[in-house]
Amino acid sequence: WKGPGKNNSALTVVRYDTLYSNWQNGQPMNKADLIYPLYFQYEWSSKINSSDLTYDPEFAAQAEVALKYLRGTKFLNDSNVISFVDYWHFDNKEIADFASVWATSPWEVNAAIERLVKNGIFAYSRSEATVKNIEWLSLIISSHAQAIRQELEKMKTERFVPPALKDIVTVDEAIKRYDASIKWITEHNHAIIGNGPYEIKNYNPTGSVISLTAFRDSSYPFVKGFWSIYETAKLAKFEKVQYPKIITRGLPVAISGNVTIGGNHDSNATLTYFIFDKNNHLITRGEGKWIDDKGNFMIAINGSSTKAMSIGPNEFKLFVKSNYALRPDIYSGIFISVPNPIAKKLT
């Protein structure tokens, strides 16, 4: 790990207050689980020399897309972490998703897999498996899971702590993790140890059947039904848009209408408009105004904007996005702009 250095900066800073739970092997999550994937992204996407064993070109091609924006990560304590990124989006939730620091499997499973790949037993990617004529690793295949279990047993015997977790995980903590994952793999015959609401009970490749069971651990932070509000997306939709088809250059004009969200008249949304001339050059843009909480809106376009319009057709686009779902509804219309007879007479 390297320090931030001097005079480094980032466009965006995101702080996460992490909700931990137990892994499905019974071990509580901690920051070591979050740190290991960070290490892995950098280690396996960078090639020091031609004999570098911790490099996968297919993985690197995917990881580098995000890594070029990541400036650093800082853990304030075990569950509070700050991510520094050179990334911006008009929706803060998109930034939070982009910069997230999370783990989908325990660090000890990832470390065991890494050792197996470095030793040429498996490959992380399909392309490397083909090039090296070895198997492409899958956590759900029984023989692969047993290889991971055997590697975990070696790590326990060696009292191994990954270099990336030095001074973060003690030997005793590591052995406790190894024991838990060894037991899990022995009992379940696969190595998919998650932290979500469902766990894989068994897998029958011959019958193409996977059986899931609910993970009812008391540490899981979301009660039953917590996510039900997302079963039906509350998308915004233009129900009615009214505007004059023919307008006079230099005179104000208004667009009005109504929006529904999830089928109900609601104003909990963002409304944006854009107006273009006949050459598709942007004339003006702005935010619409909600008249009430029933989805009725008004867009006032001043005379300066209409004066900049082309004689003839000018296109406008309306975008409405509910605050419950990101996908916008789009409405397009045409203003036919005609000269102002008074202004023409004065000239």
Model-derived regions: residue spans:
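The feature preferentially marks the first beta-strand/turn patch immediately downstream
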Residues: W1-T347
